[in-house]
Amino acid sequence: REFLQNAIDACNTRAALEWSWGTEFLEMEEARALNSMRNPYSPQISIQYNSETQRLVFEDNGIGINARDIEQYVAKIGVSFYQSEDFSTQQLHYEPVAQFGVGMLSGFMVARALLIESRKDKSVNTAWNVTDRQTLEPVTAKWIEGAETMEYINSNREQSGTRITLVLRPKYAKNLSLQRLVH
């Protein structure tokens, strides 16, 4: 469930940033007029499970993450991006679903391996964070049971968003219900 919550928040963050991108210094009416001419962002989240390979995949077209985000938020248990200064400086007006930074912990508990493929969306570089421009380079990180750290490998992901693949431990794979996962 934590991965689904993260996907929802990633899409909500991108939607809020896309709405505000380029409108930081406009009055509300001008911002609405500008946004009505843009192609609207359409959030997409998918969850897939293959019982033969015991792979559970969460994918979204949200804000995405980069290597810095993985180091500062994903790889640290109990640290949440949505409670960070990085999030608050974006000045977004919505309440994130995930707040506790336990998503990856839950992944490490149920998976034998975990793969993160992501690319950060351009909308993170708004006027609100001109002093800390985010890299938009795609990133792929993998963790295999027994490893102490995540290993980074080359990525050629072109689309903004994140795909997380978990290779489940057999005892969790046999009891998996996508229906229960989303409700």
Go through each PLM region and give its residues:
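Hydrophobic side chains in beta-strands
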Residues: 49, 60, 82, 116-118, ...
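Conserved polar catalytic motif of the HATPase_c/GHKL fold
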Residues: 2, 6
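Glycine-rich/acidic phosphate-handling loop/turn and adjacent ATP-lid/helix
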Residues: 51-93
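ATP-lid-like helix-loop hinge signature
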Residues: 7-59, 121
